[in-house]
Every structure is written in structure tokens, then in C-alpha cells.
């Protein structure tokens, strides 16, 4: 979810560092699902969402989901996502989208904004909700990172410290990045901030 501090931290530090490594995406494929602990309800016209950190989080979830659907280059999409996560304390959604699209060299911002401002955003977010709710076991907090559809809290902690190191240590193919850390490299432990799914203080507008 776009405004969970733990999600922000993992994306803008460990994941961003990994994406800078030459050939990282030859070793791993990343998928992001901007939903988290949100709730959805069906309306006469489609779907309505309430988000753990309020209306702004829902708006940024829509923006990130529309970009995910329309930006074909995974590097550009990640750079857009990383930028949004750093700037989403403001409610100037369009301003953030413009700045981040420029930074990520995305040329179809008009399509993204058309999606974001229309009913496509809610329809796509519903698909993300279905993907999230289909997790087995169900997620209990976010970030909730799976590897090949399997969740392991210890693995998530490793990826929070260094996604690049985790992938390099577990990759068995022929395209290992030259930027993989040397064996035995020790990484500082990242904060383990999470946003609990059933937090009773959530959804206060």
C-alpha cells in the first residue's frame, strides 16, 4: 500500500538499490500490487475503496496501479513507483505524477492520468484486490513479500536488508549480475516496520 512506512522504506532503499545493479532483472522479476490492507465494496457503478492511511493512500494506489498497467518497461515503472513513494506525503497527485513520469522518462503520462481520473482505476484496483486477497496464507501485514508465491518472514527480513544480496545468493542461472555483493558481505539490519491488517486504529478519515 502506497503510504505504509514499511512499504515505502523497502521500495526506496533495498529494492531501489537492487534495481541499480547491472542485470538485476535478468535474475529476478518483480511484481508490485498497490493495495495492502485496503477494503473494497461493490457499488452500482463499480467498486469503492477505503484505505488504511486514508483517502490519499487510495489515490496513490490508483495512480501506481494505472502506471503498472500502462508502463511496459519494468525499469521505468519501478522508477516511477520509487519516485511516487518518496513524494506521496502531498495531496497534489497530478503534480507528483508529472514529476515522477518525467524522472522515469515515461512518455504516456496522458494515458496514465486518463486511467487515474476515470473508472479504469477502480476496475484495475479491483483486480489488484483479488490478487491480494488470494494470497495463501492470507497476508497479516504489509509489506508482505512472496517469492514464487510463497511467504516467509525470515526471507522478507533478508530482502528488507538487501534484496540484491538475497537474489544473488539464491539465483542459480547463468546471468548473475557482476554487481552481486561479495560472499559474506554483512548488511545493516533494516527497520522491520509493518502495517497490521487488522489494526483497529486504521481507516480513520
Model-derived features: positions:
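C-terminal cap of thioredoxin/glutaredoxin-like
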Residues: 19, 88-205
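Structural alpha/beta surface segment adjacent to cysteine/selenocysteine redox centers
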Residues: 2-104, 181-196
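N-terminal start-of-chain detector that recognizes signal peptides
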Residues: 1-5, 115-118
Amino acid at each position: 500500500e502506497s503510504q505504509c512506512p514499511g512499504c515505502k522504506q523497502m521500495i526506496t532503499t533495498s529494492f531501489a538499490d537492487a534495481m541499480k545493479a547491472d542485470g538485476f532483472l535478468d535474475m529476478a522479476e518483480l511484481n508490485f500490487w498497490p493495495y495492502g490492507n485496503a477494503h473494497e465494496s461493490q457499488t452500482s457503478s463499480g467498486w469503492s475503496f477505503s484505505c488504511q492511511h486514508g483517502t490519499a493512500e487510495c489515490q496513490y494506489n490508483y495512480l501506481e496501479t494505472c502506471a503498472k498497467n500502462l508502463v511496459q518497461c519494468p525499469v521505468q515503472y519501478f522508477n516511477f513507483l520509487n519516485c511516487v513513494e518518496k513524494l506521496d506525503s502531498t495531496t497534489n497527485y497530478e503534480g507528483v505524477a508529472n514529476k515522477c513520469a518525467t524522472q522515469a522518462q515515461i512518455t504516456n503520462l496522458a494515458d496514465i492520468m486518463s486511467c487515474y481520473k476515470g473508472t479504469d482505476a477502480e476496475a484495475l484496483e479491483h483486480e489488484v484486490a483479488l490478487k491480494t486477497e488470494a494470497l495463501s496464507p492470507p497476508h497479516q501485514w504489509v509489506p508482505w513479500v512472496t517469492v514464487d508465491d510463497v511467504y516467509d518472514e525470515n526471507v522478507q527480513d533478508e530482502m528488507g536488508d538487501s534484496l540484491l544480496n538475497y537474489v544473488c545468493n539464491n539465483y542459480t542461472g547463468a546471468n548473475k549480475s557482476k554487481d552481486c555483493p561479495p560472499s559474506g558481505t554483512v548488511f545493516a539490519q533494516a527497520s522491520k516496520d509493518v502495517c497490521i491488517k487488522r489494526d483497529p486504529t486504521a481507516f480513520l478519515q
